[in-house]
Amino acid sequence: MAVVVVSIMTLFHHPVLAQMNSSSITSSNSITIPTIASSKIPTAITDPNPSYSLDNIFTLVQKSVVQVTSKVSTSLQNPQMQNTTELGSGFVYDTQGHVITASHVVDGTTLSDVTFVDGSRYTAKTIGRDPYSDIAVLQIMGNVIGPLKPLVIENSSGLRVGEQVIAIGHPFGIANTMTNGIIAQTGYLLSIPDIGVFFPDVIQTDAAINPGNSGGPLLNTKGEVIGLNVGRIISIGAPGPYPGLTVAAPSNALLRIVPTLIAKANYSHPYFGLVGSTLTSDLAQTINNLPRNFKGILVNSIVKDGPADKAGIEASTVDKYDKRHWGDIITAVDDHPVIRTEDLISYIEEHKSVGESVKLSAYRNGQIISVNTILVARPPPQIQNSLGISSPPL
């Protein structure tokens, strides 16, 4: 499947359109309840294959899902418009008061309010953000009424198209709303050029996601987290959004990234520093009469002095006579076949870290070559956008 290039309708801040019942909100300043010491995330439910009705799932998880309210600066010229209240969702990660939400929900602020279903409200500090995965971690400040109930985060690698999923969040500020649907697709790379990022292994679902849902959990029928709801797809240059096209970051990204955000406040993503495109059958036949079904990633451009550049990977070029010289076609990474750009980025995200060596196999001038390179940290989006590359580099 090709890279999907879109904008995310609900990936950005949205003003408050509804609020939780203010009469039920309790100030955290007057609460003095001992914090539970253990930070261990609970194991899965005892029954190895439980499946609950939707109402039971809601009862099981509703106390663990929170509304996230942030004050975001929007204008320096108009004092009356300097702060806008933005809404999102989140869920309890552990008993130490860590809450997971979407990074874009808390972009532009360090302090937010988290409100539980019983109306209890607490101030929370953003302690870690990763714009490349759209994951953020908040720390509730002060003591909390009663024990926190973390949600179980399940491995998302075995998800299948057609499985039932449930989303719980706060669309338009409406408290703890449940929607459901099915998994429509998994495992593709979602590219968002206007902010210079992409998300690998995205989960697509038809569960309704609206402004205010971002950062809430996507659940399976056991009430376990399989994804983090981030937005709704609209196609660039076309009217939208389109119903039934919503996306979530996979739970495996949460399992991999959240502990590092808690410990270090940021997460370093490995990257090659190249822009490539999945080789199509038509393009394959154009390149030196390759077999129609030749598979790989055509290297379109290289980030100067990046890992791919230092390893000698060659990109496509056009000479002064307007003749195109095709770049390398990456066919494998560490001897794992590469068919799509998703395969390359997913492999290094899941199996490699910054500073580790990777072997790339590539087709060049009728033969397969192999080169080794050391992965470096992906630069922040604002720096990446200044590299002169039209698409986010892998």
Locate the predicted segments by residue.
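Soluble non-cytosolic domains of exported or imported proteins
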Residues: 48, 52, 84-87, 153-160, ...
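C-terminal recognition in membrane/secretory proteostasis and scaffolding
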Residues: 1-35, 56, 125, 139, ...
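Active-site loop architecture of trypsin-fold serine endopeptidases
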Residues: 75-76, 80-84, 109-112, 145-148, ...
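Conserved active-site neighborhood of the chymotrypsin/trypsin-like protease fold
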Residues: 42, 73-74, 92-176, 336-341, ...
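A conserved glycine-rich beta-strand in the N-terminal activation segment of trypsin-fold
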Residues: 46-57, 72-96, 120-123, 149-152, ...
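Short, conserved beta-turn/loop elements at beta-strand boundaries and strand-helix junctions
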Residues: 71-73, 95, 110, 129-133, ...
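N-terminal activation segment of mature serine protease catalytic domains
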Residues: 15-79, 95, 102, 111, ...
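Terminal peptide-recognition signature
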Residues: 63-68, 90, 97-101, 124, ...
